[in-house]
Amino acid sequence: MSSAIVLSAQGLVKKFGGIVATQNVDLQLTAGARHALIGPNGAGKTTLINLLTGVLPPTAGRITLEGQDISHLSPHERVRRGLVRTFQINQLFDSMTPLETLALVVSQHRGQGGRWWSRLGQDAQVNQRAEDLLTQFHLEDVMHQATREMPYGKRRLLEIAIALACEPRVLLLDEPVAGVPAGEREELLATVAALPSDVSVLLIEHDMDLVFSFAQRMTVLVNGAVLTEGTPEEIASDPRVRDVYLGHAESQAVPHG
């Protein structure tokens, strides 16, 4: 894995009136990184992700993507430049099939936009890319099924496939196993583990088994500030991290190293 920094947040601050939601947060992702962001409920993880993706403007601080300042770019422009976030299922087109959905996303990413509706099945390159993603995410058996009829685990796989259709340099993977039944988790976890090595991944997840099996580095956020950063082994053995999780009565405490 290269040590080149792909995504960098420097001194990020976000205030809502008199409330400080993030406090001078620094975060760096290297090329091909497998990095996890963890913290108890209310730690500021969602605010930080919204800052990185442009949903919220920072009160102070700077965000760079491959050395370019993106602090004030729109979410759409950040996606175009390669910073992509997975979105939860209610933002998918429930009446569309996975094949239609991925063909639409691929078409839009390639600048074809609305022409997709009149060209479905006619663009071989778009179709091939959509079918490749369906194969990669083991969705071939439901490719012609309405999304609303798919098992929940398959829908979560489709969310990740949609993000990869945007050809990200950095993928923000937002709680991929949340709500997934136990019987559907294994396939999802295997797919997450097999994400392309050239894509830097920031995982936001409460499932500590997934976090510790996936991440090569971890950042712990508490009360809007970075408590510590390190390898999974360093995080697991840090008494401050354990105290924070036990103090917040998390359903899954940090595993012992």
What does each model-found stretch correspond to?
Residues S2-G257:
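Glycine-rich phosphate-binding loops of nucleotide-dependent enzymes
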